[in-house]
Amino acid sequence: MRVLLQRCYEASVSMEDEVISEIAGGLCLLVGFTHTDTPETVDYMAKKIVGLRIFEDESEKMNISLAERGGAILSVSQFTLYADVSRGKRPSFTKSAPGEKAEALYDLFNQKLAEAGFIVETGVFGAMMDVKIVNHGPVTIMLDSEEMRK
């Protein structure tokens, strides 16, 4: 499981020029799954994300988590996080989980974030969307469950 996390002032998802989800501040998460991901992977990543200390304290050090600070989450499915560009000019997405599995894991991930007490807005799984993010910092962090569990 990969999550591209961005601390944001605001973020929104639109389809056909209509905003379908938006948050005023917190985290925007672009979320991708691979074949080996499980519900346990999802649980681990959800807990990791809500506990990450990526907001500044009064000393301007990243020392405050979203759980401590408050804020919302915009979660957007993003199978292209598993793009393989090692050969040729066209990306391959064979490392991405099949749609049915990825959608179930994505729904579970969003449920875990909501159970942790956050407002969770989402995109539409598998749809073409326009995502607007006003990144704060900018702070952008790539989380990879395989790398984190080594």
Curated annotation (Swiss-Prot):
One CC-aspect GO term: cytoplasm
Top-rank taxon, per record: Bacteria
Keyword terms: Cytoplasm, Hydrolase, RNA-binding, tRNA-binding
Biological process terms in GO annotation: D-amino acid catabolic process; tRNA metabolic process
Location in or out of the cell: Cytoplasm
InterPro entries registered for this protein in UniProt: Daa-tRNA_deacyls_DTD, DTD-like_sf
Signal peptide: none
Position of sequence motif Gly-cisPro motif, important for rejection of L-amino acids: 137-138
GO molecular function: D-tyrosyl-tRNA(Tyr) deacylase activity; Gly-tRNA(Ala) deacylase activity; Ser(Gly)-tRNA(Ala) hydrolase activity; tRNA binding
EC number: 3.1.1.96
Catalytic activity from the UniProt record: glycyl-tRNA(Ala) + H2O = tRNA(Ala) + glycine + H(+); a D-aminoacyl-tRNA + H2O = a tRNA + a D-alpha-amino acid + H(+)
Cited CDD domains: Dtyr_deacylase
Cited HAMAP family: Deacylase_Dtd
Entry remark concerning the domains of this protein: A Gly-cisPro motif from one monomer fits into the active site of the other monomer to allow specific chiral rejection of L-amino acids.
PANTHER family documented for this protein: D-AMINOACYL-TRNA DEACYLASE 1, D-TYROSYL-TRNA TYR DEACYLASE
Family, as annotated: Belongs to the DTD family.
Subunit-structure text: Homodimer.
Biological role stated in the UniProt entry: An aminoacyl-tRNA editing enzyme that deacylates mischarged D-aminoacyl-tRNAs. Also deacylates mischarged glycyl-tRNA(Ala), protecting cells against glycine mischarging by AlaRS. Acts via tRNA-based rather than protein-based catalysis; rejects L-amino acids rather than detecting D-amino acids in the active site. By recycling D-aminoacyl-tRNA to D-amino acids and free tRNA molecules, this enzyme counteracts the toxicity associated with the formation of D-aminoacyl-tRNA entities in vivo and helps enforce protein L-homochirality.
Protein name as annotated: D-aminoacyl-tRNA deacylase
Encoding gene per record: dtd
